[in-house]
Amino acid sequence: MENVSNVDKVESIKSLQSTIRKLENALSQMTQKGANTTLVKKRLKAVCIGLAVLENVWNQESHQYIDEELAEARNILAGLLPSIEKAYDKSKAGSPQRTLLTRRIKALELSIQAIDKLFNK
């Protein structure tokens, strides 16, 4: 966790911010259609927590999350990885989609490490 380059930090934060926007848009559309939004809400909260924890570890910004929320977010973020990795495996080498997925995987992995680091203090 300590040896993360500034480029990786910036890309990870941007990736998580992009993921948050994507989930917010999905939540809005699903709400309008009357669809069940529980899963999207949980994922949105988990990604927000992941971003807050990375900013806490890297930029010493405070976060207001309790241990139970951190633990739940960690499990949700870890649960997202297999489906993203599967999409990555199906993507074409050098494609913008693969670049996006690479950054998203890295950001999620770093978020999980950051949450683990908070628990091991």
Protein language model annotation of sequence segments:
Residues 2, 8, 14, 118-121:
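Short acidic DE-rich linear segments
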Residues 1-7, 28-32, 56-67:
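Short, charged, low-complexity loops and linkers
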Residues 63-93, 98, 102:
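Amphipathic protein-protein interaction modules
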Residues 46-64, 83-90, 107-121:
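Amphipathic alpha-helical coiled-coil segments
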Residues 6-9, 37, 70, 98:
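Short amphipathic alpha-helical segments that mediate assembly, nucleic-acid/protein binding
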Residues 29-36, 90-95:
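A cross-kingdom feature marking solvent-exposed beta-strand/loop segments within repeated
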Residues 35-46, 96-107:
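Short, charged, amphipathic alpha-helical segments
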Residues 8-24, 43, 69-85:
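Short amphipathic alpha-helical heptad-repeat segments
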